[in-house]
Design a protein with these regions (language model features):
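Active-/binding-site microenvironments in catalytic and ligand-binding cores
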Residues: 1-124
Length: 124
């Protein structure tokens, strides 16, 4: 989960169009790919810059896609990016269990409902 600061609640209703909102570098996305991160949740409108001429470098790096027309064998099609999330300050940084509820659309994008659960420290 990437939560940007300041974490104002107004993020939930901001119109990001034509604002050149922050985004991830291709290198940052590649690092996450190489680190084995499967599900990226971010509170920005996109991991890529708003006007990138369709390059989508951060998306492609995260999914390890070299050519969208002919997918490479090692493309990470089981991974997801969820953009425009809001994580309230009450959710502290740390490890959580993620229930990522994804609509079963046959499309390259789908709405999702990520739910975080605290990991209980219990002794057996």
């Amino acid at each position: 989960i990437i939560r940007t600061l300041p974490n104002f609640k107004i993020k939930k209703s901001l119109n990001y169009s034509n604002t050149n909102a922050p985004y991830l570098s291709e290198e940052a996305s590649r690092f996450m790919c190489e680190s084995g991160i499967q599900h990226l949740l971010i509170d920005l409108p996109s991991v890529d810059k708003e006007k990138d001429k369709g390059e989508l470098l951060a998306h492609k790096a995260f999914w390890n896609v070299t050519d969208v027309n002919t997918l490479n064998d090692d493309a990470r099609l089981d991974c997801t990016i969820t953009e425009m999330i809001f994580v309230p300050d009450e959710v502290k940084d740390g490890s959580y269990l993620l229930n990522l509820q994804i609509a079963s659309f046959d499309n390259d994008a789908s709405p999702s409902k990520p739910v975080l659960y605290a990991i209980l420290n219990t002794k057996i």
